[in-house]
């Protein structure tokens, strides 16, 4: 990934264009992962073919999808939780092939910049989680992320540090 000052916006695609030549994995947030399988997967397995090869020390720009693959956009409500397609959740960008890496090698990945979207969600999914018996109904919160903070109209007076969170980053096993 590159620092923000080295990126130029491409407008609606929301993919950043590096000033210098750099590999990029860009996504269309208006389409589900199933319509863009060349960008990733959502069921990690070592048999999934890499989407891009990266040399040691090479920088690459990756875009990621939200945990629900865009199924809870701004304007969605509690009822939309029940309509979600569970087969679409947890989309992952990748995998990447690291040139020269072999089984047993230790790999170091440095994330140079993580830029969150301006909108995020959190929700209570019926039947899931530690407190599922106490919270049986769906509950959706839309977060506005700006200036380092996340706020939500549904939770007045609550302000949470809006620290970017990648989700997961993992290395494939040899088999």
For the regions a protein language model found, what residue spans apply to each?
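Short, charged beta-turn/beta-strand-edge "cap" motif at the junction between a beta-strand
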Residues: 65-69, 112-117
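Short, solvent-exposed loop/turn positions at domain surfaces
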Residues: 47-48, 92-95
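A generic structural signal for residues embedded in beta-strands
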Residues: 62, 106-109
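Intrinsically disordered, low-complexity linker/loop segments enriched in Gly/Pro
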Residues: 113-175
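Short, well-ordered loop/turn sites that connect or cap secondary structure elements
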Residues: 54, 98-101
């Amino acid at each position: 990934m590159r620092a923000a000052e080295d990126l130029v916006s491409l407008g609606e695609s929301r993919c950043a264009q590096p000033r210098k030549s750099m590999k990029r994995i860009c996504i269309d947030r208006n389409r589900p992962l199933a319509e863009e399988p060349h960008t990733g997967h959502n069921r990690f397995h070592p048999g999934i073919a890499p989407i891009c090869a990266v040399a040691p020390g090479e920088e690459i720009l990756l875009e990621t999808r939200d945990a629900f693959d865009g199924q809870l956009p701004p304007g969605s409500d509690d009822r939309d939780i029940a309509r979600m397609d569970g087969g679409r959740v947890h989309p992952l960008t990748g995998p990447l092939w690291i040139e020269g890496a072999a089984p047993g090698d230790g790999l170091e990945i440095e994330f140079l910049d993580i830029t969150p979207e301006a909108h995020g969600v959190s929700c209570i999914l019926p039947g899931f989680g530690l407190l599922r018996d106490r919270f049986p109904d769906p509950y959706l919160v839309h977060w506005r992320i700006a200036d380092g903070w996340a706020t939500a109209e549904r939770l007045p007076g609550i302000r949470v540090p809006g620290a970017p969170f990648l989700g997961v980053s993992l290395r494939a096993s040899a088999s």
